[in-house]
UniProtKB/Swiss-Prot annotation:
Optimum temperature is 30-40 degrees Celsius. This is Snake venom serine protease AHP-Ka. Optimum pH is 7-8. N-glycosylated. Cleavage of N-glycans reduces the catalytic enzymatic efficiency. Its main location: secreted. It comes from Gloydius halys. Belongs to the peptidase S1 family. Snake venom subfamily. Monomer.
Length: 15
């Protein structure tokens, strides 16, 4: 899912 820096960080943090 591509959204933005925040989205990328959130996904990485969740993982």
């Amino acid at each position: 899912v591509i959204g933005g820096d925040e989205c990328n960080i959130n996904e990485h943090r969740f993982l």
